[in-house]
Curated annotation (Swiss-Prot):
The lineage of its organism: Bacteria, Pseudomonadati, Acidobacteriota, Terriglobia, Bryobacterales. Pfam families: Acetate_kinase (PF00871). Mg(2+). Can also accept Mn(2+). Catalyzes the formation of acetyl phosphate from acetate and ATP. Can also catalyze the reverse reaction. Keywords: ATP-binding, Cytoplasm, Kinase, Magnesium, Metal-binding, Nucleotide-binding, Transferase. ATP binds at residues 14, 217-221, 341-345. Pathway: Metabolic intermediate biosynthesis; acetyl-CoA biosynthesis; acetyl-CoA from acetate: step 1/2. The record marks 189, 250 as: Transition state stabilizer. This is Acetate kinase. SUPFAM superfamilies: Actin-like ATPase domain. The keyword Nucleotide-binding applies. Its cofactor is Mg(2+); Mn(2+). Its EC number is 2.7.2.1. It is found in: Cytoplasm.
């Protein structure tokens, strides 16, 4: 089964074609046929496409919306220039899987998209106003392109965290605010966490119930999650992805009183304050330079700028602080797993975060940490009671697999 995996954003569309079926899932032999993305949708877009084993192609073209971006991708896939031998027409795409950010309390697992499911996603727009509307546009664009008979599946970022106990997801606010408006912790990066937990237990030959880890998904968005017996028991992101760790442009944890103070002092509306916390804070806000950790590390090596150094220190300190808190909540863990763009590619950041965790039994192997590149790798010393691993995430693979299972009515694996 050739599954088109889509991740629709406000001005971008990421896609992959993954060949998979129940037998391939069992053998862990899924095939990625191509991948790519469309950026700067709404103007002169940049379209990058790369078939399996083929050269990367980058072009620019006017793309006005998500539907036009998908149309461009599908025309490329069906053309002789794509290099994807398995796709010669739209009929060679058998299903579409979508990343959907917020499923609220309704969607506890992935779901075949029906009108009722689509309405449920729309009902969660208040919880994810920046994300769910774009996810819906991707679903509707695929329905228009393929017709209503094409099976589509929604895979929710929040679903993995529906196992949180109420003492972990409720805020210490008047209970009626939760009852009326469902104001609570939902957590995000769930598909990434689920994949990393699956890959870790596969590498270690563990059952789900034997999987006790802390994951650090570190990219432009960052989160820490405690996974006990294979299930999420607490996570740093909250009702929105703004809470928790320091991120590329998001503040993470703040004293709530700061919001009204900023509004008063700077003359900003609540919406403008929220936008500031989402787009002008984090690494960018502290450094005053960029939200890109790779650039910050390079700048620090060349100039030793105080604000850049401070941004990196605060980022690592907050992550280490969350590891300690989650270890206490779990009563200990077997491993800390790094994933995401920074987690997978910045050994210096991993080393900084783990420094000082010797009390918990974690000691980094400097050589292993430096060598890790694009593959799962233990980076702690063999004698460490608390291991550290790098495991590259693959959310698209899980979306494709969930799509197959949902369409065939197969239960999700433990």
């Amino acid at each position: 089964m050739n599954v088109l995996v889509l991740n629709a954003g406000s001005s971008s569309l990421k896609f992959q074609i993954i060949a998979t079926d129940l037998e391939r899932i069992q053998r862990d032999s899924d095939e990625r046929l191509c991948h790519g993305y469309v950026e700067r949708i709404g103007g002169e877009a940049i379209i990058t496409v790369e078939p399996r084993g083929g050269p990367r192609k980058k072009v620019t073209a006017p793309v006005r919306n998500i539907a036009a971006a998908l149309d461009y991708v599908l025309r490329w896939l069906a053309s002789d220039q794509s290099g994807v031998a398995e796709i010669r027409s739209l009929s060679d795409v058998h299903a579409v899987g979508h990343r959907v950010v917020h499923g609220g309390e309704v969607f506890r697992e992935s779901a075949v998209i029906t009108d009722e499911v689509l309405q449920g996603i729309e009902d969660c727009i208040d919880l994810a106003p920046l994300h769910n509307p774009n996810n819906i546009k991707g679903i509707l664009a695929a329905r228009d392109a393929f017709g209503s008979g094409m099976p589509q599946v929604a895979v929710f970022d929040t679903a993995f965290h529906t196992s949180l106990p109420d003492h972990a997801y409720l805020y210490a606010m008047p209970y009626h605010l939760y009852a009326r408006h469902r104001i609570r912790r939902y957590g995000f990066h769930g598909t990434s966490n689920r994949y990393v937990a699956y890959r870790y237990r596969t590498l270690r030959q563990l059952t789900r119930e034997q999987t006790n880890i802390i994951t650090l998904h570190l990219g432009n968005g960052c989160s820490a999650t405690a996974i006990r017996n294979g299930r999420s028991m607490d996570t740093s992101m909250g009702m929105t992805p703004l809470e928790g760790l320091v991120m590329g442009t998001r503040s993470g944890d703040l004293d709530p009183a700061i919001l009204s103070l900023i509004a008063t002092k700077e003359g900003l509306s609540p919406t403008e304050v929220e936008a500031l916390l989402n787009t002008q804070c984090g690494l960018l806000g502290i450094s005053g330079v960029t939200n890109d950790m790779k650039v910050l590390l390079q700048e620090l090596r060349e100039h030793d700028d105080r604000r850049i150094r401070l941004a990196i220190e605060i980022f690592c300190y907050r992550a280490r602080k969350y590891i300690g808190a989650l270890l206490a909540c779990m009563g200990g863990a077997d491993a800390v797993i790094f994933t995401g763009g920074i987690g997978e590619n910045a050994p210096e950041i991993r080393a900084r975060i783990c420094a000082g965790l010797e009390w918990a039994g974690l000691e980094i192997d400097s050589d292993q940490n430096a060598q890790t590149m694009g593959r799962p790798q233990q980076i702690s010393k063999p004698e460490s009671r608390l291991q550290a691993w790098v495991i590259p995430t693959d959310e698209e693979l899980l979306i494709a697999r969930d799509t197959v299972r949902c369409i065939l009515g197969e239960p999700h694996p433990a």
